[in-house]
Amino acid sequence: MQDPKVVIALDFDVKKDALDFVDRIDPSQCRLKVGKEMFTYFGPEFVRTLVAKEFDVFLDLKFHDIPNTVAKACIAAADLGVWMVNVHASGGEDMMIRAREGLAQFGQDKPHLIAVTVLTSMDKRQLSQIGIQSSPMEHVLTLASLTKQAGLDGVVCSAQEAAMLKETLGKEFMLVTPGIRPQGSDVGDQKRIMTPQEAMQVGVDYMVIGRPITQAKDPVAALDAINVSIA
């Protein structure tokens, strides 16, 4: 597969379980996401192991700090050989620009740099509680527009915002979407969800899928079924 669209969220708290799972999966059929829990448990060496197994790794640590600190963190991620790294758009334009500039030294090998807009667990009530009166959709557009202005590759967003973002910010602006659940899956803690087929139809570039694959009785078959459904 030339450009796998499925990014499997590796949410394991035992390294052996994670590696056993990874060894069953073909790196040409998917990419892998390592988030805060696994990175805290297993550290950067685990990421290097995945890269050595020829997986494209999305390091999902959502950096959000002063510009210099975030730039250095992104450089450290690139040194691990990751395919993609992200920051919080709410950290501001200067922070995002510094992150992008920090990665320029890696040339063609630099990872994709994307920004988180509104977490998929957030709804209008929760946004209001932190002082944001706009709807999730409006706030996503504000932060995504700022991200494009800063020169980043794209954003993490919910599938419901994808069509609007592609129309407003252009087809080249990359959309990475969690909250994707194959038909019949448990929705878990994601409030804004969509099936893989629906996500592709509205312009999602890469879909993050965790438990429907990692907790399936046959993870390889589950991944294959998703890939077939979006081919």
UniProtKB/Swiss-Prot annotation:
Is Lyase one of the keywords? yes
Name the lineage: Bacteria, Pseudomonadati, Pseudomonadota, Gammaproteobacteria, Alteromonadales
Q: What organism is the protein native to?
A: Pseudoalteromonas atlantica (strain T6c / ATCC BAA-1087)
Oligomeric form and interacting partners: Homodimer.
Pathway-wise, it operates in: Pyrimidine metabolism; UMP biosynthesis via de novo pathway; UMP from orotate: step 2/2
Under the heading HAMAP family, the entry gives: OMPdecase_type1_B
NCBIfam families xrefs: PRK00230.1 (NF001273), pyrF (TIGR01740)
- Molecular functions (GO terms): orotidine-5'-phosphate decarboxylase activity
Catalytic activity entry: orotidine 5'-phosphate + H(+) = UMP + CO2
| Alphabetized UniProt keyword annotations | Decarboxylase, Lyase, Pyrimidine biosynthesis
- SMART domains assigned: OMPdecase
- Gene name of the record: pyrF
Indicate the residues that form the catalytic site.
62 (proton donor)
Output this protein's name.
Orotidine 5'-phosphate decarboxylase
